[in-house]
Structures are given as structure tokens and as C-alpha cells.
């Protein structure tokens, strides 16, 4: 059964401006270590940051918590499997919140076009 759905859209230029201003500090602020490893290998680092930022926002909207109630931006992560499919991962604290809410897993879809990033997340009940 579906626990919740969430979506987020943002302008790539917004993330570009933030990355230009804060650089590596911004990267460490929003990405989990597993994501930073993939970020460093990315051909388009700002696009990577924007897509992951939007995916995190969509995921916490699907949780119904936003970045509050024990959730922080690095408590949810998005990594690509060997096929390139984005998958949701959790920090220990993020997993604890999921357990409390009865969330068993989820899916995320990402798209970009014309300078916009779109993320859609579906979380499943445990």
C-alpha cells in the first residue's frame, strides 16, 4: 500500500547560484557520503546537486514530515544503482523516523528539461 506521494520542482539556475556561492560547503551540507562519491564522478555536478535536492524534497513531502520532526536533508539520500535507477537510502536517524511512521521503502523518479528539475517520490507502507 502507498504511504504517501511527494513532488518537487526547481530551477537549475537556483542551485547553480548556490553552488557558485558556497561550493564544497553546499555539497557537504546537502549530500550524504554515498551521494558525494557519485557526485565526484558526475559529468554535470550542478545538475546532480539539483536533482538530488529535488528528490530529497519530494521524499520528505511523501513522508509528511518535510525537513522537520527528526528529519534533516542528509537523513535521506538518492543513489543510482548499476542500471542508473535512482534509489532512496536513509541515514540511521532517517530509518528510525521511517520505522516510527511505518514506511517500508519507496521509489523516486527524476526528470529535467529547459532548466527545470522535477522529482516525484512514492513511499510504501511497511
Q: What residue ranges belong to the model's regions?
A:
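Core catalytic alpha/beta fold that binds nucleotide/phospho-ligands
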Residues: 1-126
Amino acid at each position: 500500500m502507498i504511504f504517501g506521494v511527494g513532488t518537487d520542482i526547481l530551477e537549475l539556475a537556483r542551485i547553480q547560484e548556490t553552488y557558485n556561492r558556497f561550493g564544497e560547503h553546499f555539497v557537504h551540507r546537502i549530500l550524504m557520503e554515498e551521494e558525494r562519491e557519485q557526485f565526484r564522478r558526475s559529468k554535470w555536478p550542478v545538475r546532480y546537486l539539483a536533482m538530488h535536492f529535488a528528490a530529497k524534497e519530494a521524499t520528505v513531502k511523501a513522508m509528511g514530515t518535510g525537513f522537520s520532526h527528526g528529519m534533516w536533508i542528509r537523513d535521506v539520500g538518492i543513489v543510482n544503482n548499476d542500471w542508473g535507477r535512482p534509489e532512496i537510502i536513509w541515514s540511521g536517524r532517517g530509518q528510525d523516523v521511517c520505522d516510527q511512521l511505518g514506511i517500508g521503502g519507496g521509489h523516486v523518479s527524476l526528470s529535467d528539461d529547459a532548466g527545470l528539475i522535477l522529482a516525484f517520490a512514492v513511499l510504501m507502507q511497511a
